[in-house]
């Protein structure tokens, strides 16, 4: 779902929260959650989800936090599996993003892992840091601890 919204948002001339929210409300009622098969540190997880977010930090956009317990330096990815809440519960669930406790929703499951694989056999829309791309291969994510070096002059 977040990939669809990223794709549609790229076509909109104005930026900001209002156009983004309009797209979410436009597409949410008719969007069908997808089936996913993941391998999380060697463990297979099969789920149906509205979207899955792979986060190394808490930030999701518009000052929301999809993974409120993610840490940049813990050597782990936070995998956030979001089920589709019934439409009347969408405002309640969405507000948890702003109050930094999204993981408290019964529609959200979180995992921490060093390595994750998403099995994929068809074209899949993916949102990578706000950019929409389509892939047909499996997706693999792996944290390589202490791999970023910052030089300050």
Listing of model-derived features with the role each one plays in the protein:
Residues 1-153:
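Long C-terminal subdomains/extensions of small-metabolite kinases
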